[in-house]
Amino acid sequence: MKPEIKKQIILHLPYLAFAYLFGKVGQAFRLAQGADLSAKLLHIGQGFSAAFASAAPSFHPTDLLIGLAAAVIIRLVVYSKQKNAKKYRKGMEYGTARWGTAADIKPFIDPVFDNNVLLTQTERLMMSNRPKDPKNARNKNILVIGGSGSGKTRFFCKPNIMQLHSSYVITDPKGSLICEVGQLLQRAKYRIAVLNTINFSKSMHYNPFAYLRTEKDILKLVNTIIVNTKGEGAQSTEDFWVKAERLYYTALIGYIHYEAPEEEKNFITLLDMINASDTREDDEDYKNPVDLLFDRLEEREPEHFAVKQYRKYKLAAGKTAKSILISCGARLAPFDIKELRDLMAYDEMELDTIGDKKTALFLIMSDTDSTFNFVIAILQSQLTNLLCDKADDVYGGRLPVHVRFILDEFANIGQIPQFDKLIATIRSREISASIILQSQSQLKAIYRDNADTIVGNCDTMLFLGGKEKTTLKEISEILGKETIDSFNTSENRGKEISHGLNYQKLGKELMTQDEIATMDGGMCILQLRGVRPFFSKKYDITKHPRYKYLSDADKKNTFDVERYIRVQRKKKKQPSAVIAPEEPFDLYEIELSDEDADFIAAE
């Protein structure tokens, strides 16, 4: 039997009982003695006795008609009542908002402590993207909001780094975090990499050209450079110049990638080519050294990617080309600093291995000067695309080691092209992002209309405190309203004094804006998609089992970044440990201080 038919039969069974009952009433009235209505009513008792002498229904036409008519009338009355019934939700008239409990978060916690993202003192989120019950699956993208001094680093970044379950890409304003957690990561056999745009001497080298594989990669690199070096007050009238610059950069980088020797594939070569691209307004036939390079390449490969781009650039007249070159020079002015050119001369980052083995990459940037933040943005953009491509092409869609981006001061990194699309697709590839801001307005200032898309792709929101009005308003609205009881008392004074008492239901925000702004500094608000919000204590890092390895617990655990980089470079220069007896080799003696020798032994 079909479920719908079965449901209708069950629904109408009570009306069959009514038909039976009223059929018996009709039978009793029919069997009662008497010639008229009054006489039958006097003997109705005898009629009921006769009718119910047998439990079998009466099949007399009159009795059946009375029973069926009564059942139909009752069904119509019930239908009318249901259709016009008032909908009462007692205790829920204005809202059902409430704070979450331990039972609400329990399905989302992994029993193994290390396999969780730490959110608050009592709430955690399992790292697995495939829980036993699919309805409990949540992405690991987290939006963390907290004003200055609210503890974004202490209460969120450090606890989650101490979990040691993933590779980490960590933005580190001021460069203090690596010193505090580096010793812990080294003990756990993590490969540590650092890009420092504050002090280049304390940084490993990063060369974006080392990660160019296809023409698409070249276009992405050019786009990231354009987006993050446009300067202040860019006007729509500059569109032509920007497009012309894009063609020029694409042509030069394409030439370098496909034609230059390995040691010349870097920004230094790009700058040298731009500097050699002089023009003469009075001589349209003048050929500079770069023109000659492309002429020779065109003779050999007319359909070369770089040649196609350069042809389009060369459509500009001499005066226009000179203006384009001036724009290029202004855009790449930071590369006039020798330390930056040296930093990006070759690569030590090994970005394409971060999803293969546990790695911690620290991106140190200034929180007061954004001059070199475009370097961080280029790396972030390249890394995200590299990881996604490797997951798809090598590992069948999922990286073997989960990669977590912990992006402190996210608003200061610069704009990562297509980030709104990337954050929507990285979950399935075992990549997640924790976006840390001082207020939501920072995100809107950079990503504008795409800011809401980015927020919408974060299943978790953690508010650590702040007083920015827009943020307070949005959080208060998200928390919703609860229904509360209220009563008013009144007193009327006249010839006689009378008192009144009035009870009513009211709707109240679970937490008003002023309550959020003035909440205790040790408390936070957690919102997980599909779950009631939590008002909980911030995570106490001193209770973490690995806290003792941080410099917070013991200054002896302070990580020496310069020494680590120096030792890593010396190790790379050492000859291979295993050489065949017949294999010729050169032997180099490298002097290490006792301190450096101990450092290597510790690894």
Predicted features and spans:
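P-loop NTPase motor domains
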Residues: 21-27, 135-431, 446, 451, ...
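A residue-identity detector for tryptophan
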Residues: 20, 99, 241, 487, ...
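Basic- and hydrophobic-enriched, low-structure N-terminal and domain-boundary segments
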Residues: 1-150, 154-157, 481, 492-493, ...
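Conserved ATP-driven motor cores of ASCE-family P-loop NTPases powering translocation/secretion/packaging/pilus
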Residues: 423-525
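Short alpha-helical interface patches
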Residues: 51-54, 63-116, 215-225, 272-276, ...
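Conserved long hydrophobic alpha-helices within structured protein cores
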Residues: 113-119, 374-382, 475
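A short glycine-/small-residue-rich loop at the edge of a beta-strand within enzyme catalytic domains
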Residues: 106-108, 113, 374, 410, ...
